[in-house]
């Protein structure tokens, strides 16, 4: 690995010369040479050092809802902060024009009508509904006919969906009024104010993707406190001290991965020859759920940043995406179907394929090798180069996780398989999973980036894919 070269003038003028007794000045090395070495070391480590937060705050639970926060530098400050417990929101007589038949054989968010208080993008957020609170009536008033669960209707009380039963009193097309309570998600912020006080700012409760409160100019965010819906008390897993302000980018090797693994792509980016990029994936690549897909999808951000870095680039972006499906789905589609692999993927005749398939996450390493080796052979037959994106993190229980902090290492066999495949074959790997695994160090539970509370990243999450992709390319054209 070759270190990038940085201009040293600013470093030499701003860094103090190490004292003669320091570890950097031992032996016969001259003071000037020592300072130069110190500069090179600082610049080489710069991206990683710059991402680290100033001395992180220490957090300790001293009660069910009380947190002691200590900051030792630049001046020792300690505060005891009382966190407001999860707030129950009461909904009265929410009208549903009709209920579908309850379907027990599908995902919880699809079993029936979705209660609007717990609704996320496309789905509902589980475990927000108070399961003892749900009442369905025939009218909006308290003395209206009340329906009975198990006789007239059924509900998934974890996911907040309700549907009528065929033999019950609820008829097809009959309006129903739902009353219930739920606890929204919330992210509170611990902040160091301009006058060096540690305070707690309460976040806004939302059914999905809550943001931490804004921090004013001159203030420093120290931590976030995560309230994932109904919660009896805080635990260590709810405390997110800010350890890093950004992902710690490593110094790039020379040559950059794209120069080794994507030489034809690099040549076209630099020369201005037409470059067709195919973004191939599932609903995350489709991205139609975003507020501004034309700007926020990972592939749109990627192409915009390529054009910025390579001013002569002449890029055509093609997207082929199929929500809820995976690579096997494409390979199984018959000719003439909207998502036939040979017609829609190979038929696009891309110069560069960038694939994203979180829905392939059920594959183990041998299955990855078998499936992806076939894809690689097909792409090589076209003369196309390939970047594989590792997937984002999804619902913790879908990843066999019990928390959203201390999760640097992705536990999914699929991700291990992708890394092994890329190490064995001439393909580039954009490891977005590593970036998701460190979000907790930035004070963010990764699920707060999921608009559907499951696996649909928002624009911030899309940027993590783009950051991983751009890591492959040299910084200068």
Model-derived features: positions:
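Solvent-exposed loop/turn segments at secondary-structure junctions
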Residues: 283-287, 322-328, 358-364, 392-396, ...
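Internal alpha/beta domain cores that form substrate/cofactor-binding pockets in large enzymes
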Residues: 278, 314-348, 353-355, 360-391
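Extended beta-strand solenoid/passenger and fiber regions
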Residues: 54-159, 166, 183-184, 189-191
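Polybasic, proline/glycine-rich intrinsically disordered low-complexity segments
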Residues: 206-260
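Catalytic His-Asp segment of secreted/periplasmic serine-dependent ester chemistry enzymes
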Residues: 253-254, 258, 392-477
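Serine-esterase "nucleophile elbow" of acetyl-processing enzymes
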Residues: 254-321, 339-349, 353
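Bacterial N-terminal signal peptides
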Residues: 35-48
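N-terminal secretory signal peptides that target proteins for export/translocation
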Residues: 1-34
């Amino acid at each position: 690995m070759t270190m990038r070269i940085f201009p040293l003038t600013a470093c030499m003028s701003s860094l103090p010369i190490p004292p003669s007794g320091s570890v950097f000045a031992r032996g016969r090395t001259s003071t000037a040479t020592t300072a130069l070495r110190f500069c090179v070391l600082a610049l080489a480590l710069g991206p990683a050092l710059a991402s680290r937060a100033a001395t992180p705050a220490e957090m300790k639970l001293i009660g069910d809802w009380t947190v002691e926060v200590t900051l030792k530098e630049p001046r020792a400050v300690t505060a005891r902060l009382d966190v407001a417990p999860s707030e129950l929101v009461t909904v009265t007589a929410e009208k549903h024009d009709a209920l579908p038949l309850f379907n027990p054989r599908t995902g919880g968010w699809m079993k029936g009508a979705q209660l609007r208080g717990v609704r996320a993008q496309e789905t509902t957020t589980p475990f927000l509904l108070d399961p003892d609170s749900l009442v369905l009536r025939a009218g909006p008033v308290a003395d209206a006919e009340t329906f009975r669960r198990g006789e007239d209707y059924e509900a998934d009380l974890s996911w907040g969906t309700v549907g009528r039963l065929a033999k019950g009193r609820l008829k097809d097309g009959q309006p129903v009024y739902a009353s219930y309570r739920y606890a929204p998600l919330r992210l509170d912020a611990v902040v160091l104010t301009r006058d060096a006080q540690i305070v707690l700012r309460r976040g806004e409760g939302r059914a999905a993707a809550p943001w931490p409160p804004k921090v004013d100019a001159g203030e420093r965010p120290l931590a976030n406190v995560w309230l994932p819906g109904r919660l009896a008390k805080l635990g260590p897993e709810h405390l997110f001290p800010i350890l890093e302000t950004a992902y710690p980018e490593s110094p790039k090797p020379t040559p950059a991965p794209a120069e080794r693994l994507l030489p034809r792509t690099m040549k076209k980016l630099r020369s201005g020859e037409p470059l067709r990029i195919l973004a191939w994936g599932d609903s995350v690549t489709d991205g139609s759920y975003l507020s501004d897909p034309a700007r926020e999808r990972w592939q749109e951000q990627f192409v915009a940043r390529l054009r910025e870095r390579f001013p002569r680039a002449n890029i055509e972006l093609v997207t082929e995406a199929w929500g809820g499906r995976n690579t096997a789905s494409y390979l199984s589609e018959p000719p003439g179907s909207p998502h036939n692999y040979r017609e829609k993927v190979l038929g696009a005749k891309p110069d560069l394929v960038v694939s994203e398939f979180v829905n392939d996450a059920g594959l183990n390493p041998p299955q990855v090798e078998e499936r992806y080796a076939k894809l690689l052979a097909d792409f090589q037959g076209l003369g196309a180069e390939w970047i594989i994106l590792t997937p984002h993190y999804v619902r913790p229980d879908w990843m066999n996780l019990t928390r959203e902090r201390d999760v640097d290492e992705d536990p999914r066999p699929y991700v291990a398989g992708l890394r092994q495949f890329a190490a064995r074959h001439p393909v580039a790997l954009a490891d977005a999973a590593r970036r998701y695994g460190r979000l907790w160090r930035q004070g963010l539970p990764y699920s707060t980036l999921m608009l559907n509370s499951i696996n649909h990243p928002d624009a911030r999450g899309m940027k993590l894919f783009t950051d991983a992709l751009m890591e492959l390319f040299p910084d200068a054209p």
